[in-house]
A protein has these predicted regions:
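Conserved metal-binding segment of the jelly-roll/cupin
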Residues: 63
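UBC/E2-like fold recognition across ubiquitin and ubiquitin-like conjugation systems
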Residues: 1-57, 66-158
């Protein structure tokens, strides 16, 4: 898989780390890392790391449909939890980006491009911050899918 080779080779320069889960090429575990410490999110991640004894990263799960790249992957935050309506993260942990919907998806998108764009969207919100009282409680997959479907309906995407 071409995307896997690219991720192994170049991802660290973009603050990304990702691998398939075991032998399953359809589910990837991703880490977004190296957020600037002078940003609200960077400070929150440092505090999260110290409080919960975890890496100061945003853990994502990326699930690929069998007809990828014709259909977009489903991407969700696993942990930490974000404050409501910050960082382009829905209340259920899905990513609020049209490019991850059928109407916004382009088959030429590759994994690295998707993740760089997600990271950029999160960082573009200067108010992106964690819910430090509940940050270590993971988002559930169904919770994320439900939030994603509500978002798609709200914005008229499909």
């Amino acid at each position: 898989m071409k995307d896997l080779k690219v991720m192994k080779k170049e991802s660290s320069q973009f603050g990304l780390d990702g691998n398939p889960r075991g032998d399953n090429l359809f589910i990837w575990d991703i880490k977004l890392k190296d957020f600037p410490l002078d940003s609200k999110l960077g400070k929150n991640l440092k505090e999260y790391s110290e409080k919960y004894k975890r890496e100061p990263v945003i853990q994502l799960e990326m699930q690929f449909p069998h007809d990828y790249p014709m259909t977009p992957p489903f991407v969700r935050v696993v942990r930490p939890r974000f404050k409501f309506l910050t960082g382009h993260i829905t209340i259920g942990g899905s990513i609020c980006m049209e490019m991850l919907t059928k109407s916004g998806w382009r088959p030429i998108n590759d994994i690295e491009m998707i993740l760089v764009q997600i990271r950029s969207e999160i960082m573009s919100d200067s108010q992106a911050s964690l819910d430090l009282n509940d940050a270590d409680r993971p988002y559930g997959e169904q919770e994320a899918r439900d939030a994603f479907n509500r978002m798609v309906q709200r914005y008229g995407w499909n």
